[in-house]
Curated annotation (Swiss-Prot):
Protein name as it appears in the record: Guanosine-5'-triphosphate,3'-diphosphate pyrophosphatase
One Gene Ontology molecular-function label: guanosine-5'-triphosphate,3'-diphosphate diphosphatase activity
Keywords in alphabetical order: Hydrolase
Family note: Belongs to the GppA/Ppx family. GppA subfamily.
Key word Hydrolase present: yes
Record organism: Pseudoalteromonas translucida (strain TAC 125)
């Protein structure tokens, strides 16, 4: 059997973190990146540091065993497409060279121990290239042995620090007995605040518009909140509530919060304590989950052609290319539905709710499911969108896009929008408009679109066509009357005349 040829458009990033080792495999395709593999192993390297920052033999062997697994996957990826970075624990360890030498032998590649500042800048790059924030953004990443705090704007990190506080080191220091009490929580929070307070004034003066968390701690808390039917934004009040709920379990071994995964349980409370300290010291009002972090930042650094591009456009263009979307029809529907949104904006504040980019995305991508088959194409479109990463759109925005794409045609059931929480009303606005736009564009020609007016009063949609237009277009008239009946099933009123 011949050797496998290296896949020139496949890239790998390995992140030797203080809590977990991660491997990200991605493919450059259609002007963007498609994740084709992720491997994560809990190594808890930082737990092997003693008081003199000597890394234990046991911790080293845990790391080497993990890297032996990773090495197999690297064999058919070009060497120049592989980057391996190590962070806080190997920055701190006095015997890091011992670990590094064996790691490089196992992997056959150089291990780059990056500085805290470079780590912070790279984390920001990963967030910037996978999020939709266009203003100033605060990014927090709680790692196993360090926490990165960054303020940036667009694609540039402006203020960045790496702090020597982490969920593994704080677990060893403040929760070593695995007991959960107000006392050890508050001791951990106070210790973290001592470190964070040194940078707090500089960060608060700089200011930010949006705060994002790029760590597993933030993701774990968000999953707990969703399990409790709360919205996805973190606030200090919610963190205090989860702290109180955690203490009720008395020990880490017994900790069983709904939504908390087993692999996060051990370091969850120490990460929570650090996050509370960050919220208190920096006076963070609310925080969402970032779409990327260090690994994604390294990956985008390897592909300069993707730098500083319109992330949402890149994402949408990738779908259009991959699923052979009829671009003329997609643009036709997008143009019409955005005009509809503009006409009703006084009654339905879609723009103020940041709904226009979501409406554009749905209009351009609602037909991707046609590649599978026509009959259920709206469901196929929604399935593809749901199960594909969408850089540039937040998790909650992604859910709205999926719901609206699925709801753009056919029957809708009561309760369809309930899972969207605070975005439910926005999604209903978008669905009502996209359904009308798709019907009006059904002939797939520009010159047959009618002149009409659309108005909203007391949540009643009124479509007014030119004299005799509906009479002269019986199929369109029939489709619109059917749509009126469909919307009525959900308590929506659509008048067509």
């Amino acid at each position: 059997m011949g050797q496998l040829k290296p896949q020139k458009n496949v890239y790998a990033v390995i992140d030797l973190g203080s809590n977990s080792f991660h491997m990200l495999i991605a493919k450059s395709i259609a002007g963007g990146l498609q994740t084709i593999g992720r491997v994560k192993r809990k190594v808890r390297l930082a737990a092997g540091l003693d008081i003199d920052n000597v890394l234990s033999s046991e911790a080293m062997h845990r790391g080497w065993e993990c890297l032996a697994l990773f090495a197999e996957r690297l064999q058919d990826i070009p060497k120049q497409n592989i980057t391996i970075v190590a962070t806080a624990t190997l920055r701190l360890a006095s015997n890091a060279d011992v670990f590094k030498a064996q790691a490089e032998k196992i992997l056959g590649h150089k291990v780059n121990v990056i500085s805290g500042e470079l780590e912070a800048r790279t984390i920001y790059k990963g967030v910037a290239h996978t999020s939709s924030c266009t203003g100033s953004q605060l990014v927090i990443d709680i790692g196993g042995a360090s926490t990165e705090v960054i303020i940036g704007k667009n694609f540039d990190a402006l203020l960045y620090k790496s702090l020597n506080i982490g969920c593994v080191t704080y677990l060893e220091r403040y929760f070593k007995d695995c007991k959960l009490s107000n006392a050890n929580f508050n001791t951990a929070i106070k210790a973290a605040r001592t470190v964070i307070d040194e940078i707090a004034s500089e960060y608060k003066v700089k200011g930010w518009q949006i705060a994002s968390g790029a760590s597993g701690t933030v993701q774990a808390i968000q999953e707990i909140m969703i399990a409790q039917n709360l919205d996805e934004l973190l606030t200090l009040e919610k963190l205090y509530t989860i702290k109180k709920q955690s203490i009720a379990y008395k020990t880490i071994a017994a900790l069983d919060l709904p939504g908390l995964s087993e692999d996060r349980r051990l370091v969850f409370v120490s990460g929570l304590a650090i996050l509370i300290a960050l919220f208190e010291s920096l006076e963070i009002e609310k925080m969402g989950l970032a779409g990327g972090a260090l690994r994604e930042g390294v990956l985008y650094s390897m592909l300069p052609e993707l730098h500083n591009s319109d992330i949402r456009k890149r994402t949408i263009d990738g779908f259009i290319d991959r699923y052979h979307v009829d671009q003329k029809q997609a643009s036709r529907v997008a143009s019409l539905v955005l005009n509809l949104a503009s006409e009703v904006n006084e009654s339905w504040p879609i723009k103020a709710l940041n709904g226009l980019p979501l409406l554009t995305a749905v209009a351009q991508l609602h037909e991707i499911g046609l590649l599978i088959e026509y009959k259920q194409y709206h469901k196929h479109s929604a399935y593809i969108l749901k199960n594909t990463e969408m850089p540039g759109f937040s998790q909650s925005e992604h859910k709205v896009i999926v719901a609206v794409a699925k709801g753009h045609r056919s029957d809708l059931q009561k309760g369809y929008f309930d899972s969207l929480g605070a975005n439910s009303v926005l999604a209903q606005y978008l669905v009502r408009l996209i359904r009308i736009a798709v019907i009006l564009c059904m002939r797939r020609q520009d010159d047959v679109l009618p002149e009409f007016a659309i108005t909203v009063k007391d949540d009643v949609l009124n479509l007014q066509f030119e004299n005799d237009w509906l009479k002269n277009h019986p199929l369109m008239a029939s489709e619109l009357q059917q749509e009126s009946k469909q919307q009525a099933k959900l308590g929506w009123k659509l008048i067509v005349n």
